[in-house]
């Protein structure tokens, strides 16, 4: 397995992360990227994204509040990413409730590129064609067969797939990881999943093994959440403490404290 200095390599490069994300959590995504050591750019105008992707280190597309303009921008951005060898992270927020989002994902896979799909367990199982329980953008799924869903979807799109829940699951279609860190308080802060998607983009920007980089991003969020909860047990103060702890997180800490089972 590749040397696991994922965070160190990311911070040495300060990667430019181009985000086309939802309006609910755009500020949170920008701030957590800055705290993590990356440089965020929240550029979504469809007549600007093609050129901007070409100078970016990674592209993060979040489908949470998908408008027609964002849809056009997302497809153009994914084409530019393919042409300029820029890794792409997709967060299919709410895809079981709004089927148009699946069409957008398939279009990006057809004409552009997808390197990582990161969603909650309900979203990932839905995309994999498995039975799942969701309510709006939230998963009600207990995680059964989640790694199988990740593996199937990874093979379908030839990418890394991560499914988040009480446990988190990552697969590249052959290898996998199961992560057992985290705190329930992460579910009480809107945008925790969106922020995680941004971290996945940051860690994959300059790291070849994207199964490892995605696992590192999830560990970073979960362990920062655990540490934040030690200091702040209420949602507002927890949110601030989470960003503070992302700023202080390190490779040594995530791999020593991380409860990861490699498959």
UniProtKB/Swiss-Prot annotation:
Binding site for substrate: 42, 191
Lineage: Bacteria, Bacillati, Bacillota, Clostridia, Eubacteriales
Known EC number: 2.7.1.50
Purpose of the protein: Catalyzes the phosphorylation of the hydroxyl group of 4-methyl-5-beta-hydroxyethylthiazole (THZ).
Native source species: Clostridium botulinum (strain 657 / Type Ba4)
Pathway annotation: Cofactor biosynthesis; thiamine diphosphate biosynthesis; 4-methyl-5-(2-phosphoethyl)-thiazole from 5-(2-hydroxyethyl)-4-methylthiazole: step 1/1
Cofactor: Mg(2+)
Binding site for ATP: 118, 164
Catalytic reaction equation(s): 5-(2-hydroxyethyl)-4-methylthiazole + ATP = 4-methyl-5-(2-phosphooxyethyl)-thiazole + ADP + H(+)
The entry's keywords: ATP-binding, Kinase, Magnesium, Metal-binding, Nucleotide-binding, Thiamine biosynthesis, Transferase
Keyword Nucleotide-binding on entry: yes
Pfam families in alphabetical order: HK (PF02110)
Identification of the protein by name: Hydroxyethylthiazole kinase 1
Chain coiled-coil ranges: none
Family per similarity comment: Belongs to the Thz kinase family.
UniProt record, GO biological process: thiamine biosynthetic process; thiamine diphosphate biosynthetic process
A GO molecular-function annotation: hydroxyethylthiazole kinase activity
């Amino acid at each position: 397995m590749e040397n696991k200095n994922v965070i160190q390599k990311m911070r040495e490069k300060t990667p430019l992360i181009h985000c086309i994300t939802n309006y609910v959590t755009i500020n949170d995504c920008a701030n957590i990227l800055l705290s993590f050591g990356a440089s965020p750019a929240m550029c979504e105008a469809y007549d600007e994204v093609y050129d901007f992707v070409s100078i970016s280190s990674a592209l993060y597309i979040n489908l949470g509040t998908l408008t027609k303009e964002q849809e056009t921008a997302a497809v153009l951005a994914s084409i530019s990413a393919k042409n300029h060898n820029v890794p792409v992270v997709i967060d299919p927020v709410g895809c079981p409730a709004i089927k148009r989002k699946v069409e957008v994902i398939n279009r990006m896979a057809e004409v552009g590129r997808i390197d990582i799909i990161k969603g909650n367990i309900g979203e990932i199982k839905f995309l994999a064609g498995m039975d799942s329980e969701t309510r709006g953008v939230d998963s009600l799924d207990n995680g059964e067969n989640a790694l199988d869903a990740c593996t199937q979807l990874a093979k379908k799109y030839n990418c890394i797939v991560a499914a988040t829940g009480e446990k988190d699951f990552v697969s590249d279609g052959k290898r996998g990881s199961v992560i057992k860190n985290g705190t329930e308080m992460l579910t009480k802060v809107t945008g925790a999943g969106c922020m995680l998607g941004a971290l996945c983009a940051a860690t994959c920007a300059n790291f070849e093994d994207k199964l490892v980089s995605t696992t590192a991003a999830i560990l970073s969020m979960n362990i920062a959440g655990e540490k934040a909860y030690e200091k702040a047990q209420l949602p507002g103060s927890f949110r601030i403490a989470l960003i503070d702890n992302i700023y202080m997180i390190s490779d040594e800490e995530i791999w020593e404290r991380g409860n990861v089972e490699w498959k």
